[in-house]
């Protein structure tokens, strides 16, 4: 048996699977979980793949990309995603997390897929809301948007950031879809003083890129090495990974030179 991952409209990958373990459908999402010899369990969420053996890569990178460039991380907002492992990493800081996800049926179906599902959901500093309007009005140190935001959503979320807050969003991979990344950088650069693309170094099973944006905080100039060294139980993230995430090949430096704001 095989499952297919669409990397771009013109590029696909196939993975061998042994069995389907779960099939859950809601009004807006489809979640299928498969057993794989090489990757443990594979979750297919609306054609995007999550590999249980490698969940730590994205969760560590995004959590500490924000956490290690901010002196304080008291309030965090996560929107448009299901990744509770990201919240698990963020709890390494003294922080409160607001997690906005309307689809409880799909979220609860990840109960055996996310290793720290119960630990996160039962944490007194974790608030799950169905929509942003359900949350108390506040400003955030870090906002993580796990789907590429349109201009209207970006405008709304940026108003919820503290003056030195950090906004991290998913985007297209700069090597695979550089035009899409270029457009996303233009949109971010029209709002923020800092807008820089990055990827997860050595991650071979993903078609994702990301953007780090802020009004005042810089992902490299404001990186705090002592905070990185204080982190425990890391399997992926370190200072070298953090810095390498922003490295671009010469041709992409040229492509993005008018769109990156640093």
UniProtKB/Swiss-Prot annotation:
The UniProt record lists the keyword Cell wall biogenesis/degradation: no
Database matches in InterPro entries: PABS, SAM-dependent_MTases_sf, Spermi_synthase, Spermidine_synt_N, Spermidine_synt_N_sf
Binding site for spermidine: 83
Active site location: 155
Cellular component GO terms held in the UniProt record: cytosol
Pfam family, one: Spermine_synt_N
Enzyme Commission number: 2.5.1.16
Enzyme category, top tier: transferase
Catalysed reactions, semicolon-separated: S-adenosyl 3-(methylsulfanyl)propylamine + putrescine = S-methyl-5'-thioadenosine + spermidine + H(+)
Residues passing through the membrane, by range: none
Alphabetized GO MF terms: spermidine synthase activity
Quaternary structure, from the entry: Homodimer or homotetramer.
Name used for this protein in its record: Polyamine aminopropyltransferase
